[in-house]
């Protein structure tokens, strides 16, 4: 899922997301949208889908990760989290009930439960306390969700989030507890936050041994092309990450043959297509030399081209993975492309 934190996927028009990238769902963030433009504006607009012109499915993160990253300006209790806005310093309180109400107002097709996202280096004692707090909040989230109705004429789903840091017994317990809610789908959170790649892969395996195979399984905030294939191999169905657009704006382009730094002088007189294997028009319309020139000149068009390319590549990656799953040869295909994905060109 392309990430549209504040209601927009950076440097990309909604029409380009649909036609060039081929995205079917995007992500918005409750914390940021609550602070700006605010729920009054979104309610008056008829929900985020109408406000931003996307018009398609949206998943809203609960904002928990963002709130807990404000280590110097937030205070946590069993009731919820008090924090100060990064915009103007104003004071706010997020409780599970309040977050459910905000996500109803935003209008995401898929809503995420309010959780605590501890760092990947948290010790076992803190991980235990954090998990218990998250599970208590989850009960309150579902109670509020099931006692309220959608506002914009379509159904909304609520996904619980499995936490537990890198402790297998906590992850397994969390997975067993969340499936009691018989939700429409389940998320795996708290990974790619400082733990090792091996720990991340192990936690995905532990959780997916428990989560039902007939419901979507969403790995939050991951990751590189290799991470995505590793996750798919372990049973993950959905992912989001800011890497395609963030790295694109920093001149890093992902391709089937490896990654390109478009600021490198080696592309100065390379007039071949940006990516002969790419699926978007920018890959055919522009040359490596031209895109390198745009970055050197700090032209805004560089950010747009790179973001479209990377997002289109990521969507091509997962669609190709799906094709090989259906053909029954995913493992051999993954082995044939895996190393190239991390090569520096």
What does each of the following model-derived ranges do?
Residues 1-151, 265-268:
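Non-catalytic, usually N-terminal nucleic-acid engagement modules in DNA/RNA processing proteins
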Residues 26, 61, 103, 160, ...:
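Conserved, mostly hydrophobic/aromatic
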Residues 38-45, 248-262, 315-318:
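C-terminal helical cap(s) of enzyme catalytic domains, especially alpha/beta-barrels
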Residues 98, 102, 129, 133-140, ...:
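A non-catalytic, amphipathic alpha-helix used as a structural packing/dimerization or gating element
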Residues 108, 139, 143-146, 209-212, ...:
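Generic secondary-structure signature for well-ordered alpha-helical cores
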Residues 115-121, 275-345:
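C-terminal extensions of enzymes
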Residues 120-124, 128, 185-191, 300-303:
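Glycine- and acidic
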Residues 132-135, 144, 148, 153-274:
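Glycine-rich phosphate/ribose-binding loops and adjacent secondary-structure elements
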């Amino acid at each position: 899922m392309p990430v549209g934190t504040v209601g927009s996927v950076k440097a990309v028009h909604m029409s380009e997301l649909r036609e060039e990238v081929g995205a079917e769902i995007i992500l918005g963030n409750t914390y940021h949208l609550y602070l700006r433009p605010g729920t009054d504006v979104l309610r008056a607009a008829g929900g985020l889908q109408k406000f931003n012109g996307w018009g398609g499915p949206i998943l809203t993160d609960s904002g928990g990760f963002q709130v807990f990253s404000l280590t110097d300006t937030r205070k946590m209790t069993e009731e919820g989290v008090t924090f100060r806005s990064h915009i103007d310093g104003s004071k706010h309180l997020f409780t599970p009930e309040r977050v459910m109400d905000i996500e109803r107002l935003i209008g995401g097709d898929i809503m995420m439960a309010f959780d605590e996202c501890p760092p990947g280096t948290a010790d076992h004692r803190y991980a235990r306390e954090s998990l218990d707090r998250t599970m208590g909040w989850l009960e309150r989230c579902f109670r509020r969700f099931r006692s309220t109705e959608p506002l914009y004429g379509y159904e909304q789903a609520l996904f619980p989030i499995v936490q537990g840091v890198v402790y297998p017994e906590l992850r397994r317990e969390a997975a067993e507890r969340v499936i009691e809610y018989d939700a429409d789908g389940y998320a795996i959170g708290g990974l790619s936050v400082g733990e090792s790649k091996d720990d991340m892969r192990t936690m995905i395996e532990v959780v997916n041994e428990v989560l039902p195979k007939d419901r979507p399984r969403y790995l939050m905030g991951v990751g590189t092309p290799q991470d995505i294939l590793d996750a798919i191999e372990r049973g993950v169905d959905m992912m989001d990450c800011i890497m395609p657009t963030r790295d694109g704006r920093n001149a890093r382009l992902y391709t089937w043959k490896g990654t390109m730094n478009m600021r490198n002088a080696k592309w100065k007189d390379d007039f071949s297509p940006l990516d002969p294997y790419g699926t978007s028009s920018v890959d055919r319309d522009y040359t490596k030399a031209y895109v390198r020139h745009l970055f050197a000149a700090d032209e805004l068009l560089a950010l747009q081209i790179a973001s479209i390319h990377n997002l289109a590549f990521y969507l091509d990656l997962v669609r190709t993975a799906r094709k090989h799953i259906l053909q029954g040869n995913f493992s051999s295909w993954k082995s044939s492309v895996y190393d190239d994905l991390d090569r520096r060109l």
